[in-house]
């Protein structure tokens, strides 16, 4: 891979996450956003290294104060606050999902890989809400997972539909060629 791709691909991924994170609807301690849609799409289309670097760069940009987190949030406190579990587990989501998918993956494989990654983000979210916000596990599940099951399933279905034609269009580009 060309050296420029090593830097450009994660930067594009981080920018996509930052833009879609701004589409945010506050519905309690955890807002509804499209950042996990961006991460799922990146994880499905990018290789594991670039997918994880995209999320890592996104987290770094937010930590140093750029308003890239949901609703324009920024600062290191977001990485140790109530929603930190979700943010940190986005690294797991991107790496795992990217490792399980490739340009030959079908709808079901893409769906299941993203479902697994998203589920792990929920686990991280519950852990963060419990330990960092002092919320009982049951309440963390009720406010941090249940309201998002249907919307996230819809996002994963959209990722599964969008990524196949996207991968087909990109497969002749240097980075995406097998």
Which sequence ranges carry the predicted segments?
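Hydrophobic transmembrane alpha-helices
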Residues: 1-50
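Short helix-perturbing small/polar motifs within transmembrane alpha-helices
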Residues: 12, 19, 76-123
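Helix-boundary and loop/linker segments of multi-pass membrane transporters
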Residues: 1-3, 29-30, 70-71, 102-103, ...
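Membrane-embedded alpha-helical hairpins and interfacial helices in multi-pass inner-membrane proteins
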Residues: 72, 106-178
């Amino acid at each position: 891979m060309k050296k420029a791709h090593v830097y450009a691909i994660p930067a594009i991924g981080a920018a996509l996450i930052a833009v879609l994170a701004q589409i945010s609807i506050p519905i309690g301690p955890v807002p509804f956003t499209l950042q996990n849609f961006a991460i799922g799409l990146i994880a499905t289309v990018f290789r594991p290294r670039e997918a994880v670097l995209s999320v890592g760069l996104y987290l770094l940009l937010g930590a140093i104060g750029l308003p890239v987190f949901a609703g324009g949030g920024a600062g290191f406190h977001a990485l140790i606050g109530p929603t930190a579990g979700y943010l940190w587990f986005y690294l797991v989501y991107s790496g795992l999902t990217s490792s399980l998918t490739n340009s030959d993956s079908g709808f079901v494989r893409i769906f299941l890989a993203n479902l697994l990654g998203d589920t792990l983000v929920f686990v991280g979210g519950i852990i963060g809400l419990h330990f960092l916000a002092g919320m009982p596990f049951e309440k963390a599940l009720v406010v941090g997972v249940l309201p998002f099951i249907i919307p996230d399933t819809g996002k994963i279905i959209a990722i599964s539909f969008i990524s196949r034609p996207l991968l087909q269009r990109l497969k002749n580009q240097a980075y995406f060629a097998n």
